[in-house]
Amino acid sequence: MMKIYYKIAIIVLPAIIVSMICMNPFLSRYAAAEEKNFNFVAVGDLDCNINSMQTVNNILDKKPQIFLALGDMYYDCNPDEFMKVFSLLHGILYMTMGNHDSWSKFAGLYHLPNDKPYYSFDKGNVHFLSISTESDLRPNSTQYDFINTDLDIASQNRSISWIIVLAHRPFISSETEHITEKEDFKTYPPLFARYGVDVVIQAHVHNYQRTFPILLDNFSNPIIVTKNNTINEGTGVLYITTGGGGHDLYEFKSKSPYVQTQYAEYGIINVNSTENALTIEAYTNKDFESPKDTFTILKGYNTTKPTPMLKYVYINTSKGNGTIPTPKGLIEIPFENGTVRIPVKYNYSLPH
């Protein structure tokens, strides 16, 4: 009988590394799950203090299948104190890199699927794209090409109902500390609108903010599509800042005209995703039971709400001159002199 010998290697790692490897969601059962009804929680800027523990309890109260950690979770925490906070979130953690997360420390603590600080993944019928606002975001950068290609593919995938972008630094926010950001950020809101992103979830600013559904073809002139708290998918992009994880809160200097709700309190957002609706609820640490802010996005046209809605469609014409017939032949759009991109705004109450 042939004998087979095995060599066993024992590697001693710091407790924090071992614990974070055990928490890696890309190796857990959650990453492969395909159910369309699930909930996830998001917050950034956690830190290690009594406010952080209240935030973790708030998260656990929602029983999420995914926890989206939006950067700056560690700060200068003692590793043991950090693990007291994070060990309770075993197996559901997806990280987005923040400005206090050096890549060397970040890459050592959190395994990412492509060994880059940006990545994407699907959960059920939701596509998540995590952007690194600490890496090169200039047009034609490696990350820009990844984002552009990823959103293009996701927008054409019929099995994807919702597209959600995750970032640490905010693309759009009311005036407060940290609000002066990179010039390259202006490239992205038009890109998000073009590919039908539903929600952009961001942090860095230590408070809560939610915009109206907006569209930006020109960054300096955001268009508020509607002021309703229930909208149809494709009506506009929602920008949510949830940076009240536990670090010092930031008070507001003003309220931007495209921000609908804002407050400086610790808390999280909980998102319930189904095949036909995305419901976003903001919970403060003072009240785990009653959401302080709620917003719902409906999939497709909701016949029970006949209020006309607006949607933007980008049409790329071929070279040359001619006309573009719209569905049902309602109108024709003339074009000339090569390829142009035309924003078309139409009424949902009409056939299309």
Predicted segment positions?
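Short linear proline/tyrosine/threonine-rich motifs used for host-factor recruitment
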Residues: 322-324, 329-334, 339-343
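Extended active-site neighborhood of metal-dependent phosphoesterases/phosphodiesterases
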Residues: 78-163, 177-188, 193, 199, ...
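Secretory targeting signatures
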Residues: 1-33, 342, 350-352
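Active-site glycine-centered loops adjacent to acidic/histidine catalytic or metal-binding residues
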Residues: 45, 71-72, 98-99, 168, ...
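A short C-terminal boundary segment appended to hydrolase-like catalytic domains
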Residues: 34, 249-323
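Hydrophobic beta-strand anchors of alpha/beta hydrolase catalytic cores
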Residues: 40, 67, 128, 163-164
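N-terminal active-site segment of His-dependent metallophosphoesterases
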Residues: 26-81, 173-174
